[in-house]
Amino acid sequence: MALKDASMQIQSIVLEWPGVTAYPHRFGGVEYRLGARELGHVHGDYLVDIPFPTRVREEIVAAGLAEPHHILPDTGWVSLYLRAPGDVERAVELLRRSFDLARRKWSPAQGQGAKDAENAME
């Protein structure tokens, strides 16, 4: 069961974060990026998929905040089904965690990773 307007609620928050852009996702839905890095994507009003480093993904799954990815369970990706109003808030929190991790490695001047940011400072 999908939550009415869940994707719009998520989008209205995520696009307020500095540097975040939205694109059509290749498998449907909306993909959010910081530079070239995908922060996650939303499939309609029912599912959010978010990439994390494997260690972080294991913590998130162990805490019951999300499930292993619905198609690629042995990767760093997690899936969160939007079934209850609190799931939208949890999706935003997890997308924010992905954003915070990506932001540490991103330079708006370079639009790329930490090495580029370091080189720009030299």
Predicted segments with their positions:
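Charge-dense, helix-prone N-terminal extensions
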Residues: 1-122
